[in-house]
Amino acid sequence: MAISKKGIFFTFAAIALALIIILSFKAYKTYEMKEKIDIVGVRIDTMNNFIKDIEQDLEKGLYIASFRAFAGMGEYIASNGTYIADIDEGFNELILEGTLNNKEISLMQNSTFTDWVEKIEAEADKIDIIVNFDILDVNIEQNDPWSVLVSSDIDIVVKDKKNTSSWNRNKNIVTKISIGDFEDPLYIKNSYGRVTNAIVRSPIADFVQGGDISNLLLHLNNSYYIESSTAPNFLMRLQGDLSNSPTGIESLVNLGEFQDQGLPIEDRSAVDYIYFGTQSTTDYGIDGTPDWFKLDSNHLAIYEVQNLTI
């Protein structure tokens, strides 16, 4: 039977329509897939940027909490009249819990590292990201006389609430805390909190110039600090440990300030760890200095007064 021209037309029309439908469907599916890929890509980019921000925020939070923790230790010593028994345990308790020996420290209120981490988690939730932190440890060490290194090992899990991406890693956060301008614990403890001395690095290179002791007196009156391998470092001072350290520092105690506060003074070398300690030394008065000022024989050359003893 011969096929009419009209039948052939409708057959081709049907085939063409089918092809159009198929191609349109494929185009739609391709567009839909591309749209989904674009959305996932945006979420992944958002996650990546957020993760970078997390690492910066963690370092910032560790710095702030650590700074406050060291200042809080000074507050504790002043309030309780005792040194920190265990510097590592005490620091961990302070930076994570805001307490020291279970006593609240005002400087740490809403400022612990734990508080900081929880704030990051709350901010992440606002943009549909789930963040979980597990602080494994916090460590402190002093590798140079003028700063303390604080590090924290943290497991971090970051997930998108729509399950488009996830991220899991361990991160070691490190920050350096300058000890400059912290109060020296030795002064706080031994003056019953009446005399404080901020740790300020001495700007003086030569203490005596041609018999002129003006620089020495400036150094003494301000109780500036110099590096000293026979003295304790900052962390040791917080514990009342007066033994020597390669990262030690020392100052000369201005006993005039102790007298002004009605505190009795001792006839001892004014080098802080000796004056506040118990070791026996041979001491000398120095020409042109206050009557109460003495230096032990081991420090005469350091302060350039070998020829000025009386």
Identify what each model region corresponds to.
Residues 1-18:
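Glycine-centered recognition micro-motifs in short, flexible terminal segments and loops
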Residues 24-310:
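Long, compositionally biased, intrinsically disordered regions
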